[in-house]
């Protein structure tokens, strides 16, 4: 049975809230951006306002999918500025009482991975990534965002 769109949206919203909570517990002020804000979900920065960054959240519900889906158009991320990040959130299975897992990277690095994907140069728009396909140093790499904000 196909998953209704509103349930999929709840999964994405849960991912955004998890990321906001992780940033908050690290003392990083942040806010959810409006739903129609293009390519980003959260704004985070320093209290003095000297550094800000934008974060795109990609959530995956393991009871419904085993991969994160990116698109051919996300290859353009390879040219994004250093203040843009992606956080992949593996929501964890409620059936197994699992917690979330996170992979954090600069958006530029994610764009490069999209270009290196086997579907690059084909008519296939999908760029599917399983958690095992991500570079190991992306997992729980919250320091990537912290380092940027502390520059």
Where are these regions (language model features)?
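Mixed-charge (Asp/Glu-Lys/Arg
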Residues: 1-38, 43-151
């Amino acid at each position: 049975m196909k998953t209704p769109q509103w349930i999929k949206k709840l999964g994405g919203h849960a991912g955004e809230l998890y990321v906001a909570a992780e940033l908050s517990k690290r003392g990083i002020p942040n806010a959810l951006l409006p739903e129609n804000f293009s390519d980003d979900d959260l704004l985070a920065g320093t209290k003095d306002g000297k550094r800000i960054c934008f974060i795109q959240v990609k959530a995956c519900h393991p009871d419904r999918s085993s991969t994160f889906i990116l698109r051919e158009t996300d290859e353009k991320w390879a040219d994004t500025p250093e203040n843009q990040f992606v956080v992949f959130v593996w929501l964890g299975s409620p059936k197994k009482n699992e917690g979330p897992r996170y992979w954090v990277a600069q958006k530029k690095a994610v764009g490069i991975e999209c270009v290196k994907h086997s579907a690059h140069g084909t008519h296939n728009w999908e760029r599917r990534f399983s958690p095992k396909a991500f570079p190991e140093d992306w997992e729980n790499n919250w320091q990537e965002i912290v380092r940027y904000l502390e520059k």
